[in-house]
């Protein structure tokens, strides 16, 4: 049974993420370079987050639901405050620039993992806004990042058919 249909009428939706703390809230991002926060009960947009210059490829909520991160075609990962709508942080990997295709927080939110279409994964310290390391994560475009429920692992999956599980 369909509960609601959300339609911003602004391009293709490439990613979505449900709030970890509010069962009525979800985010969508895509080719419009916008992120919309929705209320599923009303099928209405609660807030629109701007500032991206290209497709929004992936989203992940901060573990307490107070913020979220985006991975964008312009190589940037951005963190936004859900309540105020303000951009908290913009993270750009070192050259060569490539599309950010995946993003995931650690269970504490202190670390942010970002994947790229050049098979690289960056690990960021979200408090200092600094890159901690860059890892090789397969042989091709990274399609997805996810963390384990216990927070001990993050997995990366790519177009080469491989999934790599990393200890945090």
Residue map of PLM features:
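Blade-level signature of beta-propeller repeat domains, shared across WD40, Kelch, NHL, RCC1
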Residues: 143-168
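Solenoidal tandem-repeat scaffolds enriched in leucines and small polar residues
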Residues: 1-58
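Loop/turn segments within WD40 beta-propeller blades
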Residues: 17-23, 60-66, 104-109, 115, ...
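WD40-repeat beta-propellers
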Residues: 1, 16, 35-39, 77-81, ...
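Conserved strand-to-loop turn within each blade of WD40 beta-propeller repeats
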Residues: 29-32, 71-74, 115-118, 157-160
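Loop/turn-rich, solvent-exposed surfaces of beta-rich toroidal or solenoidal domains
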Residues: 97-123
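WD40/WD-repeat beta-propeller blade N-cap
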Residues: 6-13, 50-56, 92-100, 136-142
